[in-house]
Amino acid sequence: MTAILERRENSSLWARFCEWITSTENRLYIGWFGVIMIPCLLTATSVFIIAFIAAPPVDIDGIREPVSGSLLYGNNIITGAVIPTSNAIGLHFYPIWEAASLDEWLYNGGPYQLIVCHFLLGVYCYMGREWELSFRLGMRPWIAVAYSAPVAAASAVFLVYPIGQGSFSDGMPLGISGTFNFMIVFQAEHNILMHPFHMLGVAGVFGGSLFSAMHGSLVTSSLIRETTENESANEGYRFGQEEETYNIVAAHGYFGRLIFQYASFNNSRSLHFFLAAWPVIGIWFTALGLSTMAFNLNGFNFNQSVVDSQGRVLNTWADIINRANLGMEVMHERNAHNFPLDLASTNSSSNN
């Protein structure tokens, strides 16, 4: 009899735990994805802070020339970064127990792999948690779909690109100047500025900013007056009110006359879908472009594509970009090789 009661109590305890995890009444929704997300993001954040402050130099190129990235080793907030895992490790899974000692693990950049793996798993679960909460509240799933764009971009620079290039040392460093270094080297090696998917991403980000500013300013400019001149216009809104807070007809009429009639949305739902879809699709394309360039399917090459009747090259902006790319590549990993692979062939050298 005692055993039966104990089983019921245990079952009840597990049921209460499940109910608490999946309850939408909690101040912060946890969810089953949150059970994985919370420890992963806490681990990634903790290790990042410790490594950014105190990690010793890392042999990123695998040539016994460590690069300092932490604050205690001479960097500041701008120059500091968590240095990627060493090229000597390549794509091998490199947890602490795979190293002979903690010093070796730190020297080979083990913290970078630990942070990236936990961070990516954490943001994947955050996206799943968005879907899970939407599902339990009876909402549509588009919040998680929109979040998939930055998740795809993070996956491209932290996971897909290192896989394509054969080493985690090619991943994006976790710091400000390290990010810029990654961008410059990416341009030098893959000519990303001439890749159409990157162009779509630029259109998505800048276009999304423009549309967001346009929408916000139009709404703010066509608020329905509910206050006096001596009160803030924001006081005219009460959370949960049924009445419209701005005049969409006035906003539609203004913008339609400013540009032309069909440039203005007359449907609030389709307008907000467009505001979400434009940057999301653009960033999707950027992530896809990064993932293809990871395997060296690079941007367009229009070098020396214009010649005169005598066969002499007429330089275009493509040739100017190519010269800049070569200069950046010469400075990249200058101690790891004597010259970039582009300059190793006689054809490339003769073109210069």
UniProtKB/Swiss-Prot annotation:
Annotated site location: Cleavage: A344, S345
Catalytic activity from the UniProt record: 2 a plastoquinone + 4 hnu + 2 H2O = 2 a plastoquinol + O2
Protein residues bound to chlorophyll a ChlzD1: H118
Residues bound to [CaMn4O5] cluster: D170, E189, H332, E333, D342, A344
Membrane topology of the entry: Multi-pass membrane protein
Residues carrying the site annotation Tyrosine radical intermediate: Y161
Residue positions, PTM Phosphothreonine: T2
Pfam families on file: Photo_RC
EC number(s) recorded for this UniProt protein: 1.10.3.9
Cofactor: binding details: The D1/D2 heterodimer binds P680, chlorophylls that are the primary electron donor of PSII, and subsequent electron acceptors. It shares a non-heme iron and each subunit binds pheophytin, quinone, additional chlorophylls, carotenoids and lipids. D1 provides most of the ligands for the Mn4-Ca-O5 cluster of the oxygen-evolving complex (OEC). There is also a Cl(-1) ion associated with D1 and D2, which is required for oxygen evolution. The PSII complex binds additional chlorophylls, carotenoids and specific lipids.
Keyword Transmembrane helix recorded: yes
Subcellular location: Plastid, Chloroplast thylakoid membrane
Record-level GO cellular component terms: chloroplast thylakoid membrane; photosystem II
Effect seen on changing A251V: Herbicide resistance
InterPro entries: D1/D2 (IPR055266), Photo_II_D1/D2_sf (IPR036854), Photo_RC_L/M (IPR000484), Photo_RC_L/M_CS (IPR055265), PSII_D1 (IPR005867)
Main location: plastid
Post-translational modification as stated in the protein's UniProt record: Tyr-161 forms a radical intermediate that is referred to as redox-active TyrZ, YZ or Y-Z. C-terminally processed by CTPA; processing is essential to allow assembly of the oxygen-evolving complex and thus photosynthetic growth.
SUPFAM superfamilies: Bacterial photosystem II reaction centre, L and M subunits
Sequence intervals crossing the membrane: 29-46, 118-133, 142-156, 197-218, 274-288
Oligomer and partners: PSII is composed of 1 copy each of membrane proteins PsbA, PsbB, PsbC, PsbD, PsbE, PsbF, PsbH, PsbI, PsbJ, PsbK, PsbL, PsbM, PsbT, PsbX, PsbY, PsbZ, Psb30/Ycf12, at least 3 peripheral proteins of the oxygen-evolving complex and a large number of cofactors. It forms dimeric complexes.
Name of the molecule in the record: Photosystem II protein D1
